[in-house]
Amino acid sequence: MSGRGAGGFPLPPLSPGGGAVAAALGAPPPPAGPGMLPNPALRGPGPSGGMGVPGAAAFRPMGPAGPAAQYQRPGMSPGSRMPMAGLQVGPPAGSPFGTAAPLRPGMPPTMMDPFRKRLLVPQAQPPMPAQRRGLKRRKMADKVLPQRIRELVPESQAYMDLLAFERKLDQTIARKRMEIQEAIKKPLTQKRKLRIYISNTFSPSKADGDNSGTAGTPGGTPAADKVASWELRVEGKLLDDPSKQKRKFSSFFKSLVIELDKELYGPDNHLVEWHRMPTTQETDGFQVKRPGDLNVKCTLLLMLDHQPPQYKLDPRLARLLGVHTQTRAAIMQALWLYIKHNQLQDGHEREYINCNRYFRQIFSCGRLRFSEIPMKLAGLLQHPDPIVINHVISVDPNDQKKTACYDIDVEVDDPLKAQMSNFLASTTNQQEIASLDVKIHETIESINQLKTQRDFMLSFSTEPQDFIQEWLRSQRRDLKIITDVIGNPEEERRAAFYHQPWAQEAVGRHIFAKVQQRRQELEQVLGIRLT
């Protein structure tokens, strides 16, 4: 069957082999559609050859003065299509058949292959922190009653007032929590009085005839007990300590040195030392026992365990800053305040410090970077001076026990710091609040559902006929979405639906797709690929 189209183009004969059979017989290929390029698989080696057959007419699209009027599809810009000259068979423009734009206005796009759709759908991932914050905000928004419910129930304004108060309270608690977190990072200490008790006892020597037994027997006197000896005890406790947990005495010190009289005990046995180690067990006191029956002068050197560590400044820098012993951070702050007060920072190069005559004597330079100050300051810091206590160990038999008391200032952790840590770590109230929030969300959701049901029934009671028609239209739309129905069956069953301008292009696309399908089948059967 052959003939001519509406635009005067010859229609090729249709055979079961389609375009592939026509190409095998040497017939010219079907011309391309308006505004479409010929299929590259059908083009020959020549610039305008078709199927590689000599004498094939080159493709020439018709101009605007063609016999048929130009048709512009809805939604397309002018000039995007060539004039349509009747029914023509050719490769469609744009994407391949099945994935192109809708064939007619109002028709939804073709459904995507489920396998390809599955590849394009991103895999489920755990929510990011920003998404979790969004969920939290949505939860807060879910607690708000809609305006239509507030208008319907005036008493709900009391609930909205409570919700606004809760929001302000949450903001205040969050701000205080952040302030507590910042405060815990800084050392919170209090100065307390530590009372040190230094006491000694004396045990006189015993004669050989004091006991009926002999040394080494159960009734005798050991040889060590025959020699006079004294015992020195160093203990202490905090005064007015409100904490219930008693702190060990050794925990206040980094080291303890007891220096005895060198003339009595010699250069190798006159020092008793204790230094803190990582494995040190805390104790309530120290005890030293030595033989002797003479009064002994001793010196106690106590090195406090400062947390954070403190340092003693060079005398020149201490006089300049007015700081004797402080932490490194406090020393740096005092140094910066001195630089700022005396305007020693360079006006143009802000990272430099112009040294005055005092700084030149201390740092031995006329100018230095601010980043160099910690390195130069390290050579000017020393360990703090120990606490020195002079004590006399008495061996007077009439005074069996002598006790001396000394009060020193120590820094202990502020009890408020433990309370703040417990407040931040406490989750009891949070769990209770979370459970109440869940109940509120469920109640609000139930109220919204009841409001929807009320609106449904109210609309039905007001206009039953209009309501049922609108409801049926809505149900029909939902049914089409659920069942993936494409098109409009009510319009497609009428003949006028197929007399619209898009029908010609749709038929051309359909015929071209069939020709391509038959061509592929023929190539598969023959085992060759025609070019």
UniProtKB/Swiss-Prot annotation:
Asymmetric dimethylarginine: modified positions: R81, R104
One Pfam family hit: SWIB
Residue ranges the record marks as coiled coil: none
GO molecular function annotations of the record: transcription coregulator activity
Record-listed Phosphoserine modification sites: S203
Transmembrane feature ranges: none
Signal peptide: none
S-S pairs: none
Residues recorded as bearing Phosphothreonine in the entry: T217
Top-level taxon in the UniProt lineage: Eukaryota
GO cellular component: nucleoplasm; nucleus; SWI/SNF complex
SWIB/MDM2 domain sequence ranges: 306-383
Chief location bin: nucleus
PTM comment, free text: Ubiquitinated through a signaling process involving RAC1 and the RING finger protein UNKL.
SUPFAM superfamilies: SWIB/MDM2 domain
Glycyl lysine isopeptide (Lys-Gly) (interchain with G-Cter in SUMO2) cross-link site: K226
Stretch list, region Disordered: 20-85, 202-226
Classification via InterPro entries: SMARCD2_SWIB_dom, SWIB_domain, SWIB_MDM2_dom_sf, SWIB_MDM2_domain
GO biological process, one term: regulation of transcription by RNA polymerase II
Subcellular location: Nucleus
Keywords: Chromatin regulator, Isopeptide bond, Methylation, Nucleus, Phosphoprotein, Transcription, Transcription regulation, Ubl conjugation
Subunit-structure text: Component of the multiprotein chromatin-remodeling complexes SWI/SNF: SWI/SNF-A (BAF), SWI/SNF-B (PBAF) and related complexes. The canonical complex contains a catalytic subunit (either SMARCA4/BRG1/BAF190A or SMARCA2/BRM/BAF190B), and at least SMARCE1, ACTL6A/BAF53, SMARCC1/BAF155, SMARCC2/BAF170, and SMARCB1/SNF5/BAF47. Other subunits specific to each of the complexes may also be present permitting several possible combinations developmentally and tissue specific.
Family that this chain belongs to: Belongs to the SMARCD family.
PANTHER family assigned: SWI/SNF-RELATED MATRIX-ASSOCIATED ACTIN-DEPENDENT REGULATOR OF CHROMATIN SUBFAMILY D
Function summary: Involved in transcriptional activation and repression of select genes by chromatin remodeling (alteration of DNA-nucleosome topology). Component of SWI/SNF chromatin remodeling complexes that carry out key enzymatic activities, changing chromatin structure by altering DNA-histone contacts within a nucleosome in an ATP-dependent manner. Critical regulator of myeloid differentiation, controlling granulocytopoiesis and the expression of genes involved in neutrophil granule formation.
Name by which UniProt lists this protein: SWI/SNF-related matrix-associated actin-dependent regulator of chromatin subfamily D member 2
